[in-house]
Design a protein with these regions (language model features):
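Active-site acidic/histidine proton-transfer and metal-coordination neighborhood
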Residues: 17-25, 60, 79-210, 291, ...
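Glycine-rich, proline-tolerant flexible connector loops at the mouths of alpha/beta enzymes
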Residues: 36-59, 130-137
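Short catalytic-loop micro-motif centered on adjacent basic/acidic residues
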Residues: 8-10, 36-37, 41, 180-183, ...
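Short, solvent-exposed beta-strand-terminating loops
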Residues: 68-81, 126-138, 240-251
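Conserved beta-strand positions in the central sheet of alpha/beta enzyme cores
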Residues: 36, 67-69, 127, 181, ...
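Glycine-rich, positively charged N-terminal anion/phosphate-binding segment
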Residues: 20-23, 45-62, 66, 71
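Short, small-residue-enriched loops and turns at beta-alpha junctions
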Residues: 43-44, 74-76, 133-135, 186-190, ...
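Histidine-acidic metal/acid-base catalytic patches
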Residues: 1-31, 59-61, 116, 122, ...
């Protein structure tokens, strides 16, 4: 009998105001079978919840722990060298005026301890994104100012910087059998699939260099089909998120107020992307089979990260979980429809 290969899960990054207990209760009450808390949600005191505490809460609410995301701290780790104040929302106040070297060292220690927790929980994937390793100029994706000129080559310098700054974290991940899953995303070390494949090349095919698929950032001509087919063998995790692009508006205008922007995250059912086709794409590139083999599970998570500049966060998230549960967790075909067309 045909069975689903997915289950509905939820990302914790936008729910940082909730405790782990509250987050898992919200996930369960909304209809999720799994949850992916963020690093902030699993913090406790000066460290993290113990693996036992996480397991106990998981069992209490009947919700699987599908992974622990750590986007913000990984991003700070590879961005601190720029001296940008944009790292401050994601690190403790005592680091706001510290040197880039001290911030980077703090992030490295924090992330290694987080990897210890993930390994103890038998989790294999850490969704995240690498920071501005190539500098803010290159992160614009537009070579003005010029990316190379007299005495400088920002991309070549960035390659060396990325390899050196990420070496310890990649080694620590490999030592624990973990996959560091980069979300291909604006203003990170990889804005598109070609950028990510370049990172894999310069790290000599490092096994820990993986991808979390997220179609909501495919809004500058690279479609989800193009992006995730190019990195297909590296996709070890998956977000479900939708968006619209408001017509006639510039995608890159200098306005940080989200309701004013052209690119808008929206509830899952009504965005520009067809989420069922996205789920089929994930099956086609082998994501659920890889996740199941890594974790010894019967299904792989579709991690809802639904958000909106207009709709209440909890309402948007709950709606997204229920949409995934009802529309994307479908029984998968065991044979071609053509096989049933012949005479018996």
């Amino acid at each position: 009998m045909s069975k689903p290969v997915f289950h509905a899960s939820i990302e914790g990054a936008q729910h940082g105001g909730k405790s782990l207990d509250e987050f898992l209760k919200f996930a369960k009450d909304s209809g999720a079978a799994g949850a992916q808390p963020s690093n902030f949600i699993v913090e406790s005191g000066d460290g993290f919840h113990s693996a036992k505490e996480v397991r106990d809460l998981s069992e209490k609410h009947g919700v699987k722990i599908d992974g622990i995301s750590a986007h913000c701290v990984y991003w700070v780790h590879t961005t601190a060298w720029t001296g940008s104040p944009t790292i401050r929302p994601f690190v403790p106040g005592h680091l706001h005026n510290e040197s880039p070297e001290k911030v980077e060292a703090w992030c490295e220690d924090y992330l290694i301890r987080l990897m210890d927790l993930a390994a103890e929980l038998d989790l294999k994937t850490i969704p995240m994104f690498w920071g501005i390793a190539f500098g803010w100029e290159v992160a614009t994706g537009y070579p003005w100012g010029l990316f190379s000129g007299p005495g400088y080559d920002l991309i070549e310098e960035g390659k060396e910087r990325f390899v050196n700054k990420t070496a310890k974290l990649r080694q620590e991940a490999n030592d624990r059998g973990l996959y560091i899953c980069h979300e291909i995303h604006p203003n990170t070390a990889a804005l598109c699939a070609d950028d990510f494949n370049m990172l894999v090349d310069i790290t000599d095919g490092d096994k820990s260099m993986a991808v979390i698929a997220d179609p909501s950032h495919c809004w500058e001509n690279e479609t989800p089909e193009t992006r995730f087919q190019k990195v297909r063998d590296r996709v070890m995790a998956a977000h479900v998120k939708n968006f619209v692009v408001r017509p006639g508006m510039n995608l890159r205008k200098m306005d940080g107020d989200w309701p004013n922007r052209a690119h808008q995250f929206v509830d899952l059912p009504t965005g520009d992307l067809n989420m069922v086709r996205y789920a089929e794409l994930l099956i086609n590139i082998g994501y659920p089979e890889r996740y199941k083999a890594l974790h010894g599970t019967e299904t792989a998570p579709l991690v809802v990260e639904a958000e909106s500049a207009y709709r209440d966060l909890d309402a948007t998230s709950a709606n997204g979980i229920q949409y995934v549960r009802d529309e994307l967790v479908f029984p998968v075909a065991e044979m071609s429809f053509e096989e049933g067309m012949g005479a018996k």
